[in-house]
Amino acid sequence: MKVLSGSTLNINGTLANNVILRGDRNDLAHDTIPKNWNSIKMDAGSTLTMNYARLFGGMRGLEMKQTNATINNSFIHTFQEYGIYAVGSTVTANNLVMNNCGESAIGIFRGGTHNYTHATIANYSDLLHSYNRNGIFATNEWKNESNQTEQGALILNVRNSIVYSDRENSVVFEQTPGQLFNFTLQNCLIKYSGTSEAGFNFDTSTSVIQSDKNQDPLFVNYFAAQMNLRVKQGSPAIGKGSTAVAATVPTDIANVSRTSNPTSGAYQYF
């Protein structure tokens, strides 16, 4: 699917009836296999609004170039390369669940403005075990179709979220010297292995606020065939969220209130 410049794609499901975007193979086995279709390609100057949608099983999920995207209450999983591939785009996502993407669940290139609140960005996979499988990859650079490098300022805010995987590191930042690279990780659970791999110092950075590293979220089931990224009793995500941040997204992806003792991630524990 291709959305041309100046066009708007509205995907409006409900809690009871999510809009499903997948390949044309109807057998359930293909719901857990990537590379069945290409992507939703958003041209420069296009707009996306997505609410209560399930997007899975292709090469890239949302392939956006200078796109303005608003994503709420949605699932993006099982893609050969990226769930979200964004070049110089503006993305606002609340109650987003991601998993099982080869290169990275979210790939941010040539900067942009990105806000992820109460997101569960996991990346676990047997099938794609040889890939990088980052949770978030962000850089100021992007190589265009002519193989020329373009640069862009980046603002990235991840709040009350989980970014975790079975890899040693789930967040990778590559800043270009002299380019704006502002990020905030607030009240999050992050898989982190060190400055050289992640591109930032979790322990000393003032951009890391009340977040924890390497605390297993205790997902119910992170494998694609029976994926359930709610957290179990005893999860460090329970009560981890900022109440002030939770007030901006007061119900979770299943319409459960989170205004009290908010759980980081897309699901409120109850």
Spell out what each predicted region is.
Residues 1-227, 238-249, 253-254, 267-270:
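Beta-strand/loop edge motif enriched in small/polar residues
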Residues 231-232:
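Beta-strand-rich, repetitive solenoid scaffolds
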